[in-house]
């Protein structure tokens, strides 16, 4: 992923409230547009980098269950 894109996404949401971040995520998912996927990936990268090992395990379990449901 281009480093400029990563920085642009982070700069675009830096300082946003939890409500604004949630709106950004929900809007990106509901739009269904593939052009939103890199931005969601950057946000997930930030989450992952700041998550505890317990949080990571929970996310992986949730992901695994979600993929089984598809």
Curated annotation (Swiss-Prot):
Induction: Expressed only in the forespore compartment of sporulating cells. InterPro entries: SspI (IPR017525). Keywords: Sporulation. GO terms for biological process: asexual sporulation; sporulation resulting in formation of a cellular spore. Pfam families: SSPI. It is found in: Spore core. It comes from the Bacteria. NCBIfam families: SASP_sspI. This is Small, acid-soluble spore protein I.
